[in-house]
């Protein structure tokens, strides 16, 4: 009996670490995962830059001024640092305010942890947030002794920017699985840039030689993978802001291929934003942080605020209100990256009608959108199971109005209210279908009601037609001379409304067949004009469609 108890206890003692490791890997492993190589598609990422951006704008100055008035607090060893601290330091130095106070403050602080996700075996993890955020202090003010005192600069290098040397890694500390994308980018960009600064300032120690210590090769390969297979934490709320800031640091301060790949990724994700946003309204599906519900705000996400800053530097007369996200917007306000001309054009004013599918690779869902000068119809996507960490959204119609929240928009989703069960990819050019009702915002007046269709005027010659019942919602954008002509065109092309559950002949000529009960990893659309479409999400190209 005693021997059995000993065996039992030994089994438990040896098994618990393995169980812990497996559990963390399964439930919390948020590192990059890649599948097949994504095709680029038929739409190129714009690169041409001719816009003469201004050096300052009212929005930029407001952001810097906001942070220059912030409060700084002392750091406690082992505790996460309030990220308002580095932003306030940057704001003050950028504004040239509170210089003595900020220098004395920095001299009292020391690193409180190490890089990587915080967990049981890495209880002081998460310091990469701080290292990434303080990196611009060194590069922007290291040669300005009137702002960053020499003694403070030395202390910053030795005691605050402590992620350095060799040791590039993608992994969560003390594990064999990959850390999250934003953690890797924050930690390894901070390591790379500190090493680079040390070498440029006379430290020839081999451990700081990025070209020979594995750091440059590792970071370059990681960035190349992101560019080739797609951003894993696409549109992430809140982590996109930290990924973005890391990439902007590399664009501003790195050299060679590391800088080039960081810039390519920025160009790629900004093009995605330009196509799937409308006047800074942006409500795409995203990966991480997984939540049981999603924000209903349709403006001022962490990507929008970046474009708002750059738009203000292009045209300071634009009416832009950054109500949230100033912490992320600071990076756009202080660093030199600027989007390509076409990105700004499509962000601010859609030049023509278009339809685009944008793939996000392994175990993901695509972004699909269709728009014109006066509207954008944006598909909500589909969750791939809790471990995919994807939060999908309703399919939304953005109009040229003052809407700020989901309830103020035309939108549709289904079946039911649990977004985990939705497949909101029933979407093609100027057409959306879902196994649920269409929500019509309060106060929207119909231009015509005809045979269960409600016709709303979007702009001159462009109408929204809505069909909505318990398990079927259709939103159709129709170009016609009048609401009556729009309704007649729908009726003439679709004589049997019972077929709405499986097919629709659009007045624009497209014959669309779909399956509202499609699996969550499959595009709801089956065929267009009797030609089967590629329905597998993880095979959809980066950018494909008509623009």
State the predicted function of each range:
Residues 55-59, 64-65, 72-81, 90-91, ...:
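Catalytic cores of extracellular degradative/oxidative enzymes
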Residues 13, 18-19, 59, 223, ...:
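Alpha-helical protein-protein interaction elements
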Residues 248, 259-325:
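Extended amphipathic alpha-helical segments with heptad-repeat/coiled-coil character used for oligomerization
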Residues 21-186, 208-219, 310-547:
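Ser/Thr/Asn(+Pro)-rich, low-complexity disordered segments
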Residues 138-240, 244-274, 279:
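Eukaryote-skewed repeat-based solenoidal scaffolds used as protein-protein interaction platforms
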Residues 47, 118, 171, 175, ...:
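Generic preference for well-ordered secondary structure
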Residues 1-22:
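N-terminal Sec-pathway targeting helices
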């Amino acid at each position: 009996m005693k021997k059995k108890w000993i065996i039992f206890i030994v089994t438990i003692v040896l098994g618990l670490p393995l169980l812990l490791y497996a559990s963390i890997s399964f439930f919390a492993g948020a590192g990059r995962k890649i599948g097949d190589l994504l095709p680029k598609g038929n739409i190129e990422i714009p690169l041409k830059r001719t816009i003469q951006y201004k050096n300052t704008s009212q929005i930029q100055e407001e952001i810097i001024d906001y942070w220059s008035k912030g409060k700084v607090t002392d750091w406690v060893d082992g505790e996460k640092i309030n990220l308002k601290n580095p932003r306030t330091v940057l704001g003050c130095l950028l504004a040239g305010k509170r210089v003595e106070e900020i220098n004395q403050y920095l001299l009292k602080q020391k690193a409180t942890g190490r890089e990587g996700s915080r967990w049981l075996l890495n209880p002081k993890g998460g310091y990469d947030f701080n290292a990434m955020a303080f990196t611009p202090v060194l590069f922007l003010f290291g040669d300005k002794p009137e702002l960053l005192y020499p003694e403070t600069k030395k202390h910053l290098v030795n005691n605050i920017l402590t992620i350095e040397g060799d040791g590039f890694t993608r992994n969560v500390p003390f594990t064999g699985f990959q850390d999250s994308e934003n953690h890797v980018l924050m930690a390894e960009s901070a390591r790379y840039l500190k090493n680079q600064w040390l070498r440029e300032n006379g430290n020839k120690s081999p451990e700081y030689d990025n070209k020979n210590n594995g750091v440059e090769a590792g970071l370059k390969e990681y960035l190349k993978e992101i560019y080739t297979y797609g951003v894993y934490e696409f549109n992430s709320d809140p982590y996109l802001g930290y990924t973005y800031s890391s990439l902007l640091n590399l664009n501003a301060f790195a050299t060679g291929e590391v800088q080039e790949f960081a810039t390519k990724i920025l160009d790629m994700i900004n093009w995605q934003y330009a196509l799937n946003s409308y006047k800074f309204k942006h409500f795409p599906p995203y990966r991480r942080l997984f939540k049981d519900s999603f924000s209903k705000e349709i403006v001022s996400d962490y990507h929008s605020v970046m474009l708002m800053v750059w738009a203000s530097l292009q045209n300071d007369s634009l009416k832009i209100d950054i109500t949230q996200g100033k912490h992320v917007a600071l990076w756009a306000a202080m660093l030199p990256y600027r989007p390509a001309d076409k990105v700004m054009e499509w962000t601010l004013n859609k030049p023509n009608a278009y339809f685009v599918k944008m793939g996000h690779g392994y175990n993901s869902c695509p972004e699909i959108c269709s728009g014109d000068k006066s509207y954008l119809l944006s598909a909500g996507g589909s969750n791939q199971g809790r471990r995919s960490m994807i939060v999908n959204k309703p399919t939304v119609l953005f109009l040229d109005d003052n809407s700020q929240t989901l309830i103020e928009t035309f939108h549709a989703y289904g079946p039911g209210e649990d977004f985990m069960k939705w497949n909101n990819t029933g979407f093609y050019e100027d057409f959306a279908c879902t196994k649920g009702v269409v929500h019509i915002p309060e106060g929207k007046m119909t231009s015509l009601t005809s045979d269960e269709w409600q016709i709303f005027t979007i702009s001159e010659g462009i109408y929204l037609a809505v069909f909505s019942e318990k398990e079927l919602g259709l939103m159709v954008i129709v170009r016609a001379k009048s609401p009556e002509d729009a309704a007649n065109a729908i009726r003439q092309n679709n004589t049997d409304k019972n077929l709405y559950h499986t097919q629709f002949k659009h007045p624009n000529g497209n014959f669309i067949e779909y399956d509202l009960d499609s699996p969550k990893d499959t595009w709801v659309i089956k065929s267009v004009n009797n030609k089967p479409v590629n329905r597998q999400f993880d095979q959809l190209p980066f950018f494909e469609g008509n623009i």
